[in-house]
């Protein structure tokens, strides 16, 4: 198959339209998972997919799949990301990965072409973890990291459970709709860092991502008179904590 060019103006306009959902006064975007803003974004994305004749389904975790048939019934090429954001998030984090995949399908439809394998777009629920901790909750269940019941029991700050939020938004589908097999997974994402810009490169291939680890450390000191206790006889917890903190950057260097 010869190369097919996308329509960059249409891609940009779709990103702009999506960014209007949850837009805040300071220019950020707030579409926390399974809120009304997230629901509106999902419905917009669903309408775009259905305009192309794609089959849209939702699994029991709220993950959305939009399928474009291939020439053969083989495991699909997955192109995915997420539509939920953190509070006052950016316009491209997550949304770009999905809408770029959508644009690829758009040009395939316009040219009357199909790939050998099916293409499936997937919108993962609660990727950010800004409403229901931890992040990547729904995809974590698919990967076997969490049990479904464990995910359902997660609550937000208002005490609303993940399960109830799925039901309230109308995005609790069936377990049989989960993705079972895939030939590969592709996700376009903004870098969110300075490396590409500084190296004057337009695109990079991700070989690894940062893994977040939260550690709680208790440092115990001894309270004493601040003016009369000699420095060599002090046990100041804050001083020790500052020494610990100052050593952390060195651990992250190669």
Listing of model-derived features with the role each one plays in the protein:
Residues 23-69:
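A non-catalytic alpha/beta surface segment that caps or lines the substrate-entry region
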Residues 108-129, 254:
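Short helix-loop-beta-strand segments that form the rim/entrance of peptidase-like active sites
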């Amino acid at each position: 198959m010869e190369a097919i060019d996308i329509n960059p103006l249409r891609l940009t306009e779709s990103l702009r339209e999506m960014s209007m959902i949850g837009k805040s006064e300071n220019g950020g975007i707030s579409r926390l998972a399974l809120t009304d803003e997230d629901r509106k974004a999902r419905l917009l994305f669903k309408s775009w997919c259905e305009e192309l004749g794609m089959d849209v389904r939702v699994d029991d975790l709220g993950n959305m799949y939009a399928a474009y048939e291939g020439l053969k019934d083989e495991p699909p090429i997955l192109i995915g990301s997420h539509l939920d954001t953190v509070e006052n998030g950016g316009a491209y984090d997550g949304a770009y990965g999905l809408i770029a995949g959508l644009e690829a399908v758009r040009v395939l439809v316009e040219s009357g072409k199909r790939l050998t394998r099916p293409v499936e777009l997937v919108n993962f629920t609660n990727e950010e973890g800004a409403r229901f901790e931890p992040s990547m909750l729904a995809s974590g269940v698919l990967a076997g990291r969490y049990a479904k019941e464990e995910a359902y029991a997660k609550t937000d700050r208002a005490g609303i459970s993940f399960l109830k939020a799925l039901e309230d938004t109308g995005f609790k589908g069936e377990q049989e709709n989960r993705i079972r097999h895939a030939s590969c997974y592709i996700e376009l994402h903004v870098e969110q860092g300075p490396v590409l810009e500084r190296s004057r490169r337009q695109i990079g291939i991700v070989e690894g991502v940062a893994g977040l680890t939260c550690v709680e450390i208790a440092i115990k000191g001894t309270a004493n008179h601040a003016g009369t206790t000699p420095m060599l006889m002090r046990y100041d917890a804050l001083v020790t904590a500052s020494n610990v903190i100052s050593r952390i950057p060195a651990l992250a260097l190669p």
